[in-house]
Amino acid sequence: MPKVSIITPCYKAERFIARTLESVRAQTLTDWEHVVVDDGSPDDSAQVVQGYAARDPRVRLLRQPNGGMENARNSGFAACSAGSEFLLFLDADDCLEPEALATLAGYLEARPAVGLAYCARIWIDADDRPMEDANRQPLPRFAPAWRGARVLPDSEPETPLAALVAFHLAIPSSCLIRRSVYAQTDGWDERLRRKGFEDLDMVMRCALLAPVHYVPTVLLRYRRHGGNASHVTDLAGDRVPFARKWNRSEGLSRDQVRRVRRAFDFDRFLAAHLQFRAARERVSRRDLRKGLFFWAQGVRKTLKFLLALARREGAS
């Protein structure tokens, strides 16, 4: 049985799917299976995958009518080998670094209590070029603290639910999930199809079941391009069904309800805190400019006074 089951929903990915498949085949950990679900693609995505499946028995193609990414992920999981230990839901346009599976699987094997490990990522464009603006600074992991919020250092890998909610830190392609933890969820919520919050929804459900850890090694190349699903959704408007679902707290214990509410409270606090800090920095920069202006004026007036004084003394 494979150690890792990789599930890839594929829709209109003809341009990128070969690069994704090649990144999986380049893994130093070779004990994997890759189930690619063609979700009714109108292009030649399925033909590309079929070509790889013919050459590598670890790659399998599953075809179905278009049902959305969440439905395709659920179908892919159902088609996986029952004995795999870990799951990775890899998008059809993202690429793994060669050590990704070995690093994340090794991390979880060494820490049986951890349910999900997610890695650092770099952003690439449609032509595989790193996006310098996006990669300039990694997303901070903000966590609640007695003074409001603090940034978790890399030496503290455990990422609390509040931090995961605040910045949507863990995306599917970066997450290796322990299968026994995922099996306790209901799978991907198809009611949130194309709402922009289905990824966070799954991460939250895993985080309520077991600790989530951050591995600060870049193991994923996360692609941004005009066809990304996240680019064509209105995240502000689509938050409503996601929030409504979690406000109902169906099937959650009292402790889980408390953790979820604290996470959403922290999310709102952090948004206000960061806006206030940004406004304060703008004011500080403005005051600095004013201060430099008046300082320069003062220096100029002092020099003029000293020059005039020297002239008077020279004349006398």
Describe the function of each predicted region:
Residues 2-4, 25-36, 44, 57-60:
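Short loop->beta transition adjacent to catalytic acidic/histidine clusters or analogous donor-positioning motifs
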Residues 99-143:
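Conserved donor NDP-sugar-binding/catalytic core segment of glycosyltransferases
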Residues 143-235, 239:
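Conserved nucleotide-sugar donor-binding catalytic segment
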Residues 23, 30, 38-47, 91, ...:
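A conserved acidic beta->alpha catalytic loop
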Residues 3-16, 20, 27, 37:
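A conserved hydrophobic helix/loop-capping motif in glycosyltransferases and polysaccharide synthases
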Residues 64-82:
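Glycine-rich, basic loop-to-helix element that forms the pyrophosphate-binding segment
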Residues 87:
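Short aromatic/hydrophobic "clamp" motif used to bind/position activated sugar donors
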Residues 141-143, 210, 218-226, 231-258, ...:
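Catalytic core of nucleotide-sugar-dependent glycosyltransferases
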